[in-house]
Structures are given as C-alpha cells and as structure tokens.
Amino acid sequence: DDGVEMTEEEVKRGIMDTVKNAAKDLAGQLLDKLKCKITAC
C-alpha cells in the first residue's frame, strides 16, 4: 500500500471538509458585507 488509494469514507470526509471550509469563508464574507451595510464601515 503506497498510500495513494483512498477509501470512499476518506474521500467523502475530504469533500465534506472542503465544503465546510468553503461555506465558512463564504459566510464570513457575507457577514462582513452585511456589517458594512449596517454600520457603513
């Protein structure tokens, strides 16, 4: 086993992690924009 092959579980976990991180980034950006609208930065 050279470590290249990933099980389906590992692949799913990796995708979920990526999605979660992307969602967090997106949510942060949206929150910043909302704050700017409310407080006029």
UniProtKB/Swiss-Prot annotation:
- One GO process term, biological-process aspect: defense response to Gram-negative bacterium
Q: Does the keyword Secreted apply?
A: yes
The compartments listed are: Secreted
For this UniProt entry, what's an example GO CC term? Answer: extracellular region
The entry's propeptide annotation covers 1-11
Entry keyword set: Amphibian defense peptide, Antibiotic, Antimicrobial, Cleavage on pair of basic residues, Disulfide bond, Secreted
What the entry lists under InterPro entries is as follows:
Antimicrobial_frog_2 (IPR012521)
Q: What is its main location?
A: secreted
Report the record's disulfide bonds: 36-41
Whether Secreted counts among this entry's keywords is yes
To which protein family does this belong? Belongs to the frog skin active peptide (FSAP) family. Ranatuerin subfamily.
> What is the annotated role of this protein in its UniProt record?
Antimicrobial peptide.
The identity of this protein, by name, is: Ranatuerin-2PLg
Task: Please report the organism this UniProt entry assigns to the protein.
Answer: Lithobates palustris (Pickerel frog)
